[in-house]
Amino acid sequence: MSLLTEVETHTRNEWECRCSDSSDPLVVAANIIGILHLILWILDRLFFKCIYRRLKYGLKRGPATAGVPESMREEYRQEQQSAVDVDDGHFVNIELE
């Protein structure tokens, strides 16, 4: 038994949908969601370089510093740098054979 036999059956002219009630609000909502999903997927594939480049580089700028005194900016930079610095005594040596 084919999966298509439950929803569609082949007629002499073309494929015909044998739905009991295609005006059901749930069916209409599912169709709208499906169409929107397809549109968003197409836009994502067309503009993925722009979108992901914006996310990758645009959000890494850090918090806005307008109106923040220079001393606080420098303190923030030092905190960020100290969080990145690695203690040389805690390296793990992994040898690959």
From Swiss-Prot:
Residues 44-97 are intravirion. The modification Phosphoserine is found at residue 82. Keywords: Disulfide bond, Host cell membrane, Host membrane, Host-virus interaction, Hydrogen ion transport, Inhibition of host autophagy by virus, Ion channel, Ion transport, Lipoprotein, Membrane, Palmitate, Phosphoprotein, Signal-anchor, Transmembrane, Transmembrane helix, Transport, Viral ion channel, Virion. The chain crosses the membrane at residues 23-43. It is found in: Virion membrane; Host apical cell membrane. It is a single-pass type III membrane protein. One of its GO terms (biological process) is symbiont genome entry into host cell via pore formation in plasma membrane. One of its GO terms (molecular function) is monoatomic ion channel activity. Coiled coil: none annotated. When the channel is activated, one or more imidazole moieties of His-37 probably become bi-protonated. Homotetramer; composed of two disulfide-linked dimers held together by non-covalent interactions. May interact with matrix protein 1. HAMAP family: INFV_M2 (MF_04069). This is Matrix protein 2. The gene is M.
